[in-house]
Amino acid sequence: MLARRDLAVCAPLQLELLYSARGPADYSVLREELEGLVELHATPDAEAEALRTQQALAAKGQHRGPKPVDLLIAAIAKVHGAVLLHYDRHFDLIVRVTGQPAEWLARRGTLG
């Protein structure tokens, strides 16, 4: 697995991860763990990239697959030159349009 210094997060990803917390204590622990990671920030370029990607997906009739937050996460990774590490098939649709580097965290269907 990657070292913590090799991982980065962005605010939309943190919101998604923290949404899954089972309660206040779990939320606090997870938030503290995330604070130790490098943070990539949304920029106007990332916002524009997310919109371009959604438009390209719409041209193929696939714009209703990836959630808007997934488009923004992918765009932030792209503009910062980061590899998109994910466990969601919708990112495969995004990557086919953007051509950005991406990797599955684990083989699809193997994590709970």
Model-derived features with residue positions:
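IMPase-like, lithium-sensitive Mg2+-dependent phosphomonoesterase catalytic core
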Residues: M1-A3, L13, D26-V29, A102, ...
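Alpha-helix capping/helix-boundary segments
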Residues: L13, A46, I73, H90-F91
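PIN/NYN-family metal-dependent endoribonuclease catalytic core
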Residues: M1-G23, L37-D45
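A short secondary-structure junction motif
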Residues: P12-E32, L51-A59
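A short acidic, often aromatic-flanked loop/helix-cap motif at beta-alpha or helix-coil junctions
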Residues: L15-E16, D45-E49, R108-G112
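Acidic, PIN/NYN-like endoribonuclease modules and their adjacent C-terminal/linker elements
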Residues: A74, K78-G112
